[in-house]
Amino acid sequence: MASPAPLQRLQAPLRRSLARAAVLSSRTYATIPSPSDPGLTQSSPSPAASTTPAKKAPRPSYFKDTTVASFSEFVGSQSAPLSLSEAYEIKTAEVGPAGRKRTITRLPEWLKTPIPSSGANPNFGKIKADLRGLNLHTVCEEARCPNIGECWGGNDKSAATATIMLMGDTCTRGCRFCSVKTNRKPPPLDPHEPENTAEALARWGLGYVVLTSVDRDDLADGGARHFAETIRRIKQKKPTLLVEALTGDFMGDLDMVKIVAESGLDVYAHNVETVEGLTPYVRDRRATFRQSLKVLEHVKAVRGKEGIITKTSIMLGLGEQEQEIWDTLRELRKIDVDVVTFGQYMRPTKRHLKVEKYVTPDEFDLWKQRALDMGFLYCASGPLVRSSYKAGEAFIENVLRKRAGERAAASASLDQVVAAEETKAL
């Protein structure tokens, strides 16, 4: 019997591999020599390759979930660093089907943040679970804040912060920059919310907390008493916890402002949001620039200039002019507002106001310095800064604790003087 052919003596998988290699080697391919392969020589191109130019090899895909470069990326980059104009260049793109394409503006690199997830940061999931279990809402989620991953992502709960939104998740106003749900008749207030909020904050072991709320124009007091009761419950459970309240304007009712201001809070915040000229186009028609100034001014009248810190926030990128920003800062200093923050307006949905300008980080730094030069106690200014910004909270916490220490020292000194006088009298 004749011996089998050499190929037939091989195992089946190996036979298939050799057969596939033989077929592939019989085909003609255009090859592009690589500089890294010195032994590779370019063969004569096939007729098909001579008429069609070889396409440039695409850059490899690369994904990174943080905006901060690692050390190896920093020292190993083969490309030259971008110039300032290149770094701040606003890019556009054409989207849509053929014949109906439209140009859109890409989000600048300095506004991009990693998408938060419970898998990447377990603490994010823990805080979210606590909030759901106690039926609490946060402005971080409702207003789609870009800093939610940073603020909720501390190494432990004491390093994390969350801005609790009281009185539900539905607002009676419809500001053109805000993505919070609106309705003329929101659900009634949750009577357990003050206790649940205090319980959650005591459980986290925070040193500083921010409370805010939707506007509730459907309530006789605008929710002022509910706000004040929540603050009192928090102070009962943890007297050392510093509380910041970011309130609405209570439709200009200064008696309601007084109720919240006297509830034991440490920082009273109310946002003017934008310059006076743009207020009618940006905010709900029931909110006015002058009404907001009266709220902030009345807080100082109730608690005294040194008795409480007042704070406000301004969005940039809505079409405001430089002189209008100057005028706004001067108005705020007239009524002794202590803290101001600047942040980039970012359009939450297509139904909201368009972004007129993406303000560069350098411009934000400039406005921070200008605000400090005007006498503001503190200014947080940056593209991703929001009114309840984590870095700003740390600074204000230090100021408040320093003031408390000074008051305690002054009180102790006064007690010593009184005791000395009483001793002399004896």
Curated annotation (Swiss-Prot):
GO terms for molecular function: 4 iron, 4 sulfur cluster binding; lipoate synthase activity; metal ion binding. It catalyses: [[Fe-S] cluster scaffold protein carrying a second [4Fe-4S](2+) cluster] + N(6)-octanoyl-L-lysyl-[protein] + 2 oxidized [2Fe-2S]-[ferredoxin] + 2 S-adenosyl-L-methionine + 4 H(+) = [[Fe-S] cluster scaffold protein] + N(6)-[(R)-dihydrolipoyl]-L-lysyl-[protein] + 4 Fe(3+) + 2 hydrogen sulfide + 2 5'-deoxyadenosine + 2 L-methionine + 2 reduced [2Fe-2S]-[ferredoxin]. The keyword Ribosomal protein does not apply. Its cofactor is [4Fe-4S] cluster. Its EC number is 2.8.1.8. It is found in: Mitochondrion. Pfam families: LIAS_N (PF16881), Radical_SAM (PF04055). Residues 43-55 have a biased composition (Low complexity). This is Lipoyl synthase, mitochondrial. Binds 2 [4Fe-4S] clusters per subunit. One cluster is coordinated with 3 cysteines and an exchangeable S-adenosyl-L-methionine. InterPro entries: Aldolase_TIM, Elp3/MiaA/NifB-like_rSAM, LIAS_N, Lipoyl_synth, rSAM. Residues 27-42 have a biased composition (Polar residues). Keywords: 4Fe-4S, Iron, Iron-sulfur, Metal-binding, Mitochondrion, S-adenosyl-L-methionine, Transferase, Transit peptide. Residues 154-377 form the Radical SAM core domain. [4Fe-4S] cluster 2 binds at C171, C175, C178. Belongs to the radical SAM superfamily. Lipoyl synthase family. Residues 1-29 form a transit peptide.
